[in-house]
Amino acid sequence: ALAVGDRLGGHIVAGHVDCLATVESITRIGDSLVCRLGFPEAFGPEVVPKGSVALDGISLTINECGKNFLTVNIIPDTQERTTMRLWKPGVSVNMETDIIGKYVRRQLPGSRDGANGDEKGAAASSAGITRDFLLGNGFF
């Protein structure tokens, strides 16, 4: 387990699958592979360029993305040491979006707030994130 004070050299992967993504294409560029994957549009807001995603538990950086797709670059070491070497177009893979992005999204107006009856989160969502909200919650 990661201890408080330990160096975090990547992104936090909880191991919870958010959805299935489908490998749409794999293109070789030099020694690397560029993989394009499609996923349900509902997860689009949690995927950002240069952000992180876990695909089949492999922590990767997102190159580009849209409402229902993303691309990642797979270096030779990752190709050899992970199950991604089994990927081919049409294969489904487990996708986990970044946990920090989920927390940020939850605070935005129109998000999926209140799922756990969290009044504080719902209040942030209905009013948006304001200076008063941040002051009242210890951010200043």
What are these regions (language model features)?
Residues 1-140:
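Structural preference for solvent-exposed beta-strand-turn elements
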